[in-house]
Amino acid sequence: MAFFSIFAKYLENEKMKHIFMVNTVAGKHSCLNEVKEAISRDTSFSDYEIYTPESASDNTDFIKKYLEEHPNQETRFYACGGDGTANKVASGVVGHPNASMTVLAHGSGNDYIKYYADLETFQDADKVLHGEEHRVDIMKANDRYALNATHFGLDAVVAKAMNKIRRHTIFGGKMCYPFAVVWGFLTGMRTKCTVYADGEKLNDGKICLCTVANGKYVGGSYKCAPKSKNDDGLLEVCLVKPLSRFRFPFLIKTYTEGSHLDNPKFKNLIVYRRAKQVVIEGGKNFCVSLDGEIMEAQRIVVDNMQQAIRFVAPTV
């Protein structure tokens, strides 16, 4: 049986086009050489190419154009980078039934993949190249997309800061998120906005932070949506009401563990819902983070597109 399974996978790879979208500036170092080495070791990948975009948006544009020109070609796209690269790849793949995607993790943020396995597993090219396909949800926020999470309030302040320092010599790489959190703690503890989940008003016009998620993690280690199922068509909405800086560290501890939803100490502080649609009404210069990518809009409508993405995850 093992032989036939391996042979079937070989035939699948033979007829499929494999395109590696390599973000040459993800994290602090490029993963281009690692990708080339992984492909050279695997003789089953006869039809492939490597694409290195000049800018982040080039990923999405390239994928859309390729799929429009090859509507009958079964194609798998590999997001070689972090959450931002995965976001751009997913934004190009969505709506194309002949396309699938996966992630070769190599960036400063790799939150979505933690739904399936740890970072090291998604850095193992051999495991990723021969993974199992799943149909997963993706959310549409106005005219853009998020695979993992749409988050705002303190989270958006942190994401903005993170984008500025992620490639800094000292503060970049794995340390950029903790430094960004400190900046958010000092400047972004209260945001004016109103949130609706399937028409239900969740707050009185102010929040500390809010995540709308299909994945489970944000910020590298914060388990914001421990009950999430990324294929059920429902968004996990976790809204934290304004709180003092003194109380905030106690919340963060449970937020990291993923125990915040069931902790009685924060019962009156956290609003949790599952919804198909979330509407966010903010003010001037209001922004949200879409998988770490910043979008500004005064009104944002987030709809979940159930099982609209074919995502390949390593078998663990």
Regions found by a protein language model. Name each.
Residues D155-V158, N203-G205, Y217-S221, R245-P249:
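Short acidic/glycine-rich loop or secondary-structure boundary segments that cap or lie
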Residues V22-T24, G81, K241, G282:
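Short beta-strand/turn micro-motifs composed of small residues
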Residues M189-T191, K206-C208, D231-E236, K276:
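A generic structural signal for short beta-strands and their flanking turns/coil linkers
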Residues A197-G199, K229, L239-V316:
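ATP/nucleoside-binding phosphotransfer catalytic cores, i.e., glycine-rich phosphate-binding loops
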